[in-house]
Swiss-Prot record:
Protein name as catalogued: Structural maintenance of chromosomes protein 3
Post-translational modification: Phosphorylated at Ser-1083 in a SPO11-dependent manner.
Organism whose genome encodes this protein: Mus musculus
Similarity section: Belongs to the SMC family. SMC3 subfamily.
Main location per the UniProt record: nucleus
GO molecular function, one term: beta-tubulin binding
Sites where the protein binds ATP: 32-39
């Protein structure tokens, strides 16, 4: 076993949690500067293991907590982990952790994370070899110097500690204390014996007179007994007579109470029936109100539908007339359009012919004009240009410009041609699209009509289901009211049961149910749920005739909880307390009940109570435990006899009870408050309530849920249809919008077609003129430059002038004619497009709209809905009439029940009056019985006061009359007066004092024997203490010599025991001392005393020569330290520990001796662990592991370091120390 690891937090200079790397099982060296925390590390281990820190005051605990920068430390702990692979600690683990935690108000030990006491820790350490008498397995800083300078007496004290004499001293002190106490008791007993002897002498003289007194007193008591006994017998006879009368009266009272209870039961039954009928009436009236509200709503809906149907019929009638009018108007419009189109067809050829002529004339006029202009220009170029070349140059330039202009004109003409062709193609495409859209429009209209029809079908079905649901809701409401009434009835019965049972018990039952519900909800402890079987009362049945006796027998045990095992009850109670639930509970664990079979008496006057109970055989133990030792008897007399004979509890059917111990209990028991009856009623009401709830859930609510689901489905269908309707109507509007747009496009295209044609003709005429000019210029190119036209050209000019004038005149005539025809065409087209055709479109649209409603879909749906609402109104009125009839019949039934209630009330009152009269008579008898019982008690008391009497006293005076008895009694009293001064207790006192004397003598002998035993024990303890010191001295002395020779080769050292009877200059070794001790003590006692020893001296020689042996005072400081170390090693060899902690033990040694100490530690480290601190390099050589302690920011840290780092630190510290 050794220290494997140390964990420190908050202790002295170690603030943060410091986990020291595991130690070697041999030699570990810790190095560090002064004040870095090495000693605090040793203090931490000592804090856990040593007695030095056992009883710390609060201020001492605070002093051990770390103080530094940062937040204040409020608690600290030191944990030591031991390697226990050798099982030196009696714990079956290879690693054992021991932790001590302190704070301002706490000081706790934890062994393997479990809290233990300080004594447990100390006992555990002692079992592992840590002796309280030898604390030298931890050697603190300065301890070596302290031992080196200690006097001889101090070393003797140390030797006594190592020898363990403290135990002997403690036992000796206890023995001395016990001996003093025994001596005091012996003196007291002697005083008492002296007093008793004197008192016995006095009582001997009083005994003679007492004998005469006792003779007459015996006679007096016999006479008084006879008188009292006669009075007692007379009183008993009268009591028996009264008991017989009371029994007869009690039977009559029972009959009257039974009759009264029957009347009350009938009244309660009638009240229940009246409540149920009133609840039924209330439900019917509420249903009637609901029906009335429904009927009002239905009538309102019917009125709306009737108005809507009428409006639709009127609308359809008006639509028919309008359609005829529109068709007639459309026909007229078509005729007018045809007429105008015919007129247009006649005018357009004329217009086109005139226009064509005009265009040809304009083109010819432009050509002739251009040709003339060219000829004039040709004439002018003679004066314009000076030479032919200049003119040709200009013509070429002009031709180039003309070619470009002609090309531009051709492109424009080609573009207009293409535009006209595209317009014609678009016109055809537009027409195709328009026809397609018209076809789609008809399909969409048909689909909208179909959706309208489907929508109204679904709506009608939904309305029918809603009507059915309303009926079911009314039914559910009626059932809910019946359920509420039944629940109210159950609550009343539960309240009665609560009133008859203790609040704590009922709270306990409720709390147990909460615990089980918690388990069920969490899905845990299934075996606990299965192992709980409810209270006793819920687990059996019996005939009502036995309710009273069963209930009286069980009492509150009726509410004990049956469980399979004590484990189940423990689990329930743990959760019960964890949830802080109220109430009290008592469990009957079947596995713990010890029930034995009972031998019941074979008699016709009694039966075992358990035979009249019906229960699950599984719970036989529980019921035998509660009822197994009880008999149901015919009468109280039988109960008394059987209880005495068979030591069993007996009870009558009326609840009068006789305990096997002799106690009698009984009296009137109110059966109306029977808890078994109440529990039966509660259970029955719960079953009825469960049936009603099941019916409500299985039938009505399931149907309502089904209808709700169907209505939701229909509502979803209606929403889907509405969505589709909106979609198709939007599609229809979109198609109409597209058709309108196409029509407008076509009209716009027709409007732009004619201007484009005219523009084309103008461009073509201009192109001809430009081509003519180009040809003229080309012809002129290369000709001679002339200032005058040639004759041919002049003729051509004249001819052109004539042609131009003629063409202008023709063109004016054609223009006038074209304008006239164009005006006619424009007027006709405008009338067609802006008037006739536009109106025709409007008429067509109105006809289409009329066609949408013309099918009567809405009217058909409205008519169907109206028929359905009429049927619902009729059904509602029929149901309302049925409810009126039912209400009348139910109210009549209530009146009959109320009459019956009055009759039963009168009967109950008659029985009550009879019971009251009987009760008064019974009270009189009870008062008389009470007086007789009092007299009986007085007689019995006086007889008891007479004390024990001889047998002759019971028979001697039985034949005498009361008069004679009183006469003899008077004579006895006269004689007794003569002995009034006699000590009547003289004989008793004499016997009593004699007995006390014997007891005291025995006690005195016991004390004498005890005193002798204590003296013997003290002698044995003194001898053992002497032997222990002698043995320890020999072992330590031997070890000291051996260790010193190893530390100082060639040296010699001995220990010397010093004694009190020897002069201070005289000292002897262990052997001589032993002989002197025995001789010195032999003159006084056979037991040698350790008090003769005064000290332990040390004599050493560092050279080995006998003549150079010196005392400790004669040695240098380093030699003293070495000797002290040798003594410590010797003590440790005598009482070895599993590990040792040395704090700077080599401080005062020179290098040679430090090396010897290091070698010694290396030798001892084979069998024990060493943890040492040093500032010298010698101890490092024998070490197996090295640790360095650093102090940063007022906090210590300890880490594993290498041997080289440890040597460097020691050398550096030695250099700069």
């Amino acid at each position: 076993m050794y220290i494997k690891q140390v964990i420190i937090q908050g202790f002295r200079s170690y603030r943060d949690q410091t986990i020291v790397d595991p130690f070697s099982s041999k030699h570990n060296v810790i190095v560090g500067r002064n004040g870095s925390g090495k000693s605090n590390f040793f203090y931490a281990i000592q804090f856990v293991l040593s007695d030095e820190f056992s009883h710390l005051r609060p201020e001492q605990r605070l002093a051990l907590l770390h103080e530094g920068t940062g937040p204040r430390v409020i608690s600290a702990f030191v944990e030591i982990i031991f390697d226990n692979s050798d099982n030196r600690l009696p714990i079956d683990k290879e690693e054992v952790s021991l932790r001590r935690v302190i704070g301002a108000k706490k000081d706790q030990y934890f062994l393997d994370k479990k809290m233990v006491t300080k004594n447990d820790v100390m006992n555990l350490l002692e079992s592992a070899g840590f002796s309280r008498s030898n604390p030298y397995y931890i050697v603190k800083q300065g301890k070596i110097n302290q031992m080196a300078t200690a006097p001889d007496s101090q070393r003797l004290k140390l030797l006594r500690e190592v020898a363990g004499t403290r135990v002997y001293d403690e036992r000796k002190e206890e023995s001395i204390s016990l001996m003093k106490e025994t001596e005091g008791k012996r003196e007291k007993i002697n005083e008492l014996l002296k007093y008793i002897e004197e008192r016995l002498h006095t009582l001997e003289e009083e005994k003679e007179e007492l004998a005469q007194y006792q003779k007459w007193d015996k006679m007096r008591r016999a006479l008084e007994y006879t008188i009292y006994n006669q009075e007692l017998n007379e009183t008993r006879a009268k009591l028996d007579e009264l008991s017989a009368k009371r029994e007869t009266s009690g039977e009559k009272s029972r009959q009257l109470r039974d009759a009264q209870q029957d009347a009350r039961d009938k009244m309660e039954d009638i009240e229940r029936q009246v409540r149920e009928l009133k609840t039924k009436i209330s439900a019917m009236k509420e249903e009637k109100e609901q029906l009335s509200a429904e009927r009002q709503e239905q009538i309102k809906q019917r009125t709306k539908l009737e108005l809507k149907a009428k409006d639709l019929q009127d609308e359809l009638a008006g639509n028919s007339e309008q359609r005829k009018r529109l068709l007639k108007e459309r026909q007229k419009l078509l005729e007018k359009i045809e007429e105008k189109q015919k007129e247009l067809a006649e005018t357009e050829p004329k217009f086109n012919s005139v226009k064509e002529k005009e265009e040809r004339g304009i083109a010819r006029l432009a050509q002739a004009t251009q040709e003339r202009t060219d000829l004039y220009a040709k004439q002018g170029r003679g004066s314009q240009f000076t030479s032919k070349e200049e003119r040709d140059k200009w013509i070429k330039k002009e031709l180039k410009s003309l070619d470009q202009a002609i090309n531009d004109k051709k492109r424009q003409i080609a573009a207009i041609h293409k535009d006209l062709e595209d317009t014609e193609a678009n016109k055809e495409k537009n027409l195709e699209q328009y026809n397609k859209l018209d076809q789609d429009l008809n399909e969409v209209k048909a689909r909208v009509e179909e959706l309208d029809r489907k929508y109204y079908e679904v709506k009608n079905k939904k309305d029918e289901l809603q009507s059915e649901r309303n009926y079911l809701w009314r039914e559910e409401n009626a059932e809910q009211q019946a359920l509420a009434a039944k629940r109210e009835d159950l609550e009343k019965k539960q309240q009665l049961l609560r009133a008859a049972t203790g609040k704590a018990i009922l709270n306990g039952i409720d709390s147990i149910n909460k615990v089980l519900e918690h388990f069920r909800r969490k899905g845990i402890n299934q075996h606990v749920q299965n192992g709980y079987h409810g209270i006793v009362m819920n687990n059996f049945e019996c005939e009502p005739a036995f309710y009273t006796c069963v209930e009286v027998t069980a009492g509150n045990r009726l509410f004990y909880h049956i469980v399979d095992s004590d484990e189940v009850s423990t689990k329930i109670l743990m959760e019960f307390n964890k949830m802080n639930l109220p109430g009290e509970v008592t469990f009957l664990p079947l596995n713990k009940l010890d029930v034995r079979d009972t031998a019941y008496p074979e008699t016709n006057d009694a039966i075992p109570m358990i035979s009249k109970l019906r229960y699950n055989p599984r719970f036989d133990k529980a019921f035998k435990h509660v009822f197994g030792k009880t008999l149901i008897c015919r009468s109280m007399e039988v109960s008394t006899q059987l209880a005495r004979a068979f030591t069993m509890d007996c009870i009558t059917l009326e609840g009068d009870q006789v305990s096997h111990r002799g106690a009698l209990t009984g009296g009137y028991y109110d059966t109306r408050k029977s808890r078994l009856e109440l529990q039966k009623d509660v259970r029955k009401a719960e079953e009825e309530l469960g049936e009603l709830e099941a019916k409500l859930n299985e039938n009505l609510r399931r149907n309502i849920e089904r209808i709700n689901n169907e209505i939701d489905q229909l509502m979803n269908q209606m929403q889907q249809i509405e969505t589709q309707q909106r979609k198709f109507k939007a599609s229809r509007d979109s198609i109409l919008s597209e058709m309108k747009m196409l029509k407008e496009k076509r009209q716009q295209s027709e409007k732009t077609f004619m201007p484009k044609q005219r523009s084309l003709q103008s461009l073509e005429a201009s192109l001809h003129a430009m081509e003519s000019t180009r040809e003229s210029l080309k012809a002129e190119l290369g000709t001679d430059l002339l200032s005058q036209l040639s004759l041919e050209d002049q003729k051509r000019v004249d001819a052109l002038n004539d042609e131009i004038r003629q063409l202008q005149q023709e063109n004016r005539q054609l223009l006038n004619e074209r304008i006239k025809l164009e005006g006619i065409i424009t007027r006709v087209e405008t009338y067609l497009n802006e008037n006739l055709r536009k109106r025709l479109d409007q008429v067509e649209q109105e006809l289409n709209e009329l066609r949408e409603t013309e099918g009567g879909t809405v009217l058909t749906a409205t008519t169907s809905e109206l028929e359905a609402i009429n049927k619902r109104v009729k059904d509602t009125m029929a149901r309302s009439e049925d409810l009126d009839n039912s209400i009348d019949k139910t109210e009549a039934g209530i009146k009959e029940l109320q009459k019956s209630m009055e009759r039963w009330k009168n009967m109950e009152k008659e029985h009550m009056d009879a019971i009251n009269h009987d009760t008064k008579e019974l009270e009189k008898m009870t008062n008389r019985q009470g007086m007789l019982l009092k007299k009986k008690e007085e007689c019995m008391k006086k007889i008891r006061e007479l004390g024990s009497l001889p047998q002759e006293a019971f028979e001697k005076y039985q034949t005498l009359s009361l008069k004679q008895l009183f006469r003899k009694l008077e004579q006895c009293n006269t004689e007794l007066k003569k002995y009034s001064h006699v000590n009547k207790k003289a004989l008793d006192q004499f016997v009593n004092f004699s007995e006390q004397k014997e007891k005291l003598i025995k006690r005195q002998e016991e004390l004498d024997r005890g005193y002798k035993s204590i003296m013997e024990l003290m002698n044995v303890l003194e001898l053992r203490k002497y032997e222990a010191i002698q043995l320890t001295f020999k072992q330590v002395s031997k070890n000291f010599s051996e260790v010193f020779q190893k530390l100082v080769p060639g040296g010699k050292a001995t220990l010397v025991m010093k004694k009190g009877d020897v002069e201070g200059s005289q000292s002897q070794d262990e052997g001589e001392g032993s002989g002197e001790s025995e001789r010195g003590s032999g003159s006084q006692s056979s037991v040698p005393s350790v008090d003769q020893f005064t000290g332990v001296g040390i004599r050493v020689s560092f050279t080995g020569k006998q003549g150079e042996m010196r005392e400790m005072q004669q040695l240098s400081g380093g030699q003293k330290s070495l000797v002290a170390l040798a003594l410590i090693f010797a003590i440790q060899k005598c009482d070895p520990a599993p590990f040792y902690l040395f704090d700077e033990i080599d401080q005062a040694l020179d290098a040679q001796h430090r090396k010897a100490v290091s070698d010694m530690i290396m030798e001892l480290a084979v069998h024990a662990q060493f943890i040492t601190t040093t500032f010298r390099p010698e101890l490092l050589e024998s070490a197996d592991k090295f640790y360095g302690v650093k102090f940063r920011n007022k906090v210590s840290h300890i880490d594993v370091i290498t041997a080289e780092m440890a040597k460097d630190f020691v050398e550096d510290d030695t250099t700069h120390g």
